[in-house]
């Protein structure tokens, strides 16, 4: 899997005009059929208008008058001629406007498309052409002849670059052909097609865009450079961070400007904001020994 496949690029006469590579990460991956089914169902559901609507008894006009009195007629009691059991009445629990869209993560959509394309590539149902028309004018007749020379002209998906106006105009009127821009390629149209025909520019645009997206997802965030002054705020004998170097075992608290030595009874409960190499370095930075300062306060009392 993930092997790059090389196929021939054909000209309008059906002759080889070069070769094109189908990257393995796009055209040779495992095909996850349940995933493709889920994405296609979501895509078709999102295409539904969802504008269906029925009227309830409160929305149907009329029916404000009670049709007959409550008692004495021998008939069943009725309160309105627009009740659901009446002809012309409202509908109970009828369809209302709603959205059928389903949330589908981008990674799932991309994986389904790659799987569908890989299945087509393994069946040799993907073709690449330089162009569908030889000339500067659109020609549906010539485009149809080119496509017929590749495979059966039935459910053909043509993928073009957006700037390829001549080819676009040449095939858009063919009932057997569905044409898309490279950035419009989707799982449903790939699954629904029997053959996919890329123009050279369309394939380059599709592969280029997908490769850029893949690189953006896989790129690791750059680790910001740590400022030396931030690591050593009080000189070389101080260190700010969670993993102090060996020998930095004096804990300093910048809020109280006190430091704790390992022999301090509060050493284990103290969260170090700054580490010092020695007590002298902490005192030089303006910190005082927490144990001595507390004992001096008790003596003063």
Curated annotation (Swiss-Prot):
Region (Disordered), start-end ranges: 49-105
Keyword RNA-binding included in the entry's annotation: yes
UniProt keyword annotation of Membrane present: no
Entries under InterPro entries matching the protein: Ribosomal_uL4, Ribosomal_uL4-like, Ribosomal_uL4_dom_sf
PANTHER family cross-referenced by the UniProt entry: 50S RIBOSOMAL PROTEIN L4, LARGE RIBOSOMAL SUBUNIT PROTEIN UL4M
Reported function: One of the primary rRNA binding proteins, this protein initially binds near the 5'-end of the 23S rRNA. It is important during the early stages of 50S assembly. It makes multiple contacts with different domains of the 23S rRNA in the assembled 50S subunit and ribosome. Forms part of the polypeptide exit tunnel.
Homology family: Belongs to the universal ribosomal protein uL4 family.
Protein name: Large ribosomal subunit protein uL4
Organism: Cutibacterium acnes (strain DSM 16379 / KPA171202) (Propionibacterium acnes)
């Amino acid at each position: 899997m993930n092997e790059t496949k090389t196929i021939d690029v054909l000209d309008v006469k059906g002759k080889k005009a070069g070769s094109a590579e189908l990257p393995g990460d796009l055209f040779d991956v495992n095909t996850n059929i349940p995933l493709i089914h889920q994405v296609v169902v979501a895509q078709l559901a999102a295409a539904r208008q969802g504008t269906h609507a029925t009227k309830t008894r409160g929305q149907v006009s009329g029916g404000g008058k009670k049709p007959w009195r409550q008692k004495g007629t021998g008939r069943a009691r009725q309160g309105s001629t627009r009740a659901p059991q009446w002809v012309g009445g409202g509908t109970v629990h009828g369809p209302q406007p709603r959205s059928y869209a389903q949330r589908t993560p981008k990674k799932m959509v991309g994986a389904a498309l790659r799987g569908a394309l890989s299945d087509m590539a393994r069946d040799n149902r993907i073709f690449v052409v330089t162009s569908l028309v030889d000339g500067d004018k659109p020609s549906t007749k010539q485009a149809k002849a080119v496509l017929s020379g590749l495979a059966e002209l039935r459910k053909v998906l043509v993928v073009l670059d957006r700037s390829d106006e001549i080819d676009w105009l040449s095939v858009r009127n063919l009932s057997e052909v569905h044409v898309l821009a490279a950035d419009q390629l989707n799982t449903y149209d790939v699954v629904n097609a029997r053959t996919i025909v890329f123009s050279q520019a369309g394939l380059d645009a599709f592969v280029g865009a997908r490769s850029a997206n893949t690189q953006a997802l896989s790129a690791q965030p750059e680790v910001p450079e740590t400022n030396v002054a931030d690591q050593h705020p009080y000189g070389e004998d101080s260190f700010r961070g969670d993993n102090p170097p060996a020998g930095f075992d004096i804990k300093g608290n910048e809020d109280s400007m006190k430091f704790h030595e390992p022999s301090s009874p509060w050493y284990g409960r103290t969260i170090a904001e700054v580490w010092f190499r020695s007590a002298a370095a902490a005192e030089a930075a303006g910190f005082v020994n927490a144990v001595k300062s507390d004992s001096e306060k008790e003596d003063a009392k």
